[in-house]
Regions:
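A short, polar/proline- and glycine-enriched secondary-structure boundary/capping micro-motif
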Residues: 16, 59, 69-73
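A common structural junction motif
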Residues: 27-28, 65-72
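Alpha-helix C-cap/termination motif
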Residues: 41, 64-65
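Conserved catalytic core of Hanks-type protein kinase domains
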Residues: 51-52, 64
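Short, electropositive alpha-helical surface patch
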Residues: 58-64
Length: 87
């Protein structure tokens, strides 16, 4: 299943620096396939796309980043966009 996670964080300089440094070194859980992330410093959010069938991997990923607040959405790829998938 594909997921889009929107992570929000405080926009203070210390938090942003820490997140950027950790992000460069971070290894996604091995159960994540095709993980991609986009970081918006000014907006205080990151968008992460990944594929996994393992709920524990999602939990492990979110606990690795306690300073972030996650909204995670299951999505289905279509020809023109990603569509929200109702569970």
């Amino acid at each position: 299943m594909h997921y889009i996670a929107i992570a929000t964080f405080a926009r203070d300089l210390g938090t942003v620096k820490e997140i950027l440094l950790r992000r460069r070194q971070y290894t996604y859980p091995s159960e994540f396939k095709n993980a991609q992330s986009y970081f918006d410093v000014q907006g205080g959010r990151a968008v992460i796309h990944f594929e996994t069938d393992n709920a524990e991997a999602i939990l492990r990923y979110t606990t690795d980043w306690p300073e972030l607040v996650f909204d995670i959405f299951p999505v289905i790829p279509t020809e023109s966009a990603w569509e929200y998938s109702t569970p």
